[in-house]
Amino acid sequence: MTPSQAKLLIVNADDFGITEGATDAIIECHRAGSVTSTTLMTNMPAAAYAAQRAREHPALGVGLHFNLTSGRPLGAAAGSSIVDSRGGLLNGRDLALRAITGRLRAGAVR
């Protein structure tokens, strides 16, 4: 690859799939040339919509948004130390509190 072919800056848009509106905004930024990649939140309500939009724009790089603090877990997590009493993922503060107080069980994330 010659220096003129190398990408000098990668602009990644976070939270692809969190909502249809956010997903569409990321696609529009990509089409305008300002976003080169994004990370998909696979457990969010608009994840399937985002996956479809990504297929329509194959030049958009899509990676995984590793998410432990928003929405509901994709796998079986009942009774897990990373979920709240309603079955949703803990927010960042509560997850950190469990970790530093020793209440985050090994194997909770797999």
Set out the residue ranges of the language-model regions.
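Non-cysteine beta-strand/loop elements that form the S-adenosyl-L-methionine
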Residues: G61-L68, L90-G92
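Acidic (Asp/Glu)-rich catalytic clusters
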Residues: I26-A32, A50-G61, S81-G88
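Structural preference for beta-strand elements that scaffold enzyme active sites
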Residues: L8-I10, V35-T39, A59-H65
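Boundary/entry segment of secreted carbohydrate-active catalytic domains
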Residues: T2-E20
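Active-site beta-loop-alpha junctions enriched in small/polar residues
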Residues: D14-F16, M41-N43, H65-G71
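CE4/NodB-like, metal-dependent polysaccharide N-deacetylase domain
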Residues: V109-R110
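Active-site gating loops and adjacent loop-to-helix segments of metal-dependent hydrolytic enzymes
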Residues: P73-R105
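A short alpha/beta connector and helix-capping loop motif
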Residues: E20-P45
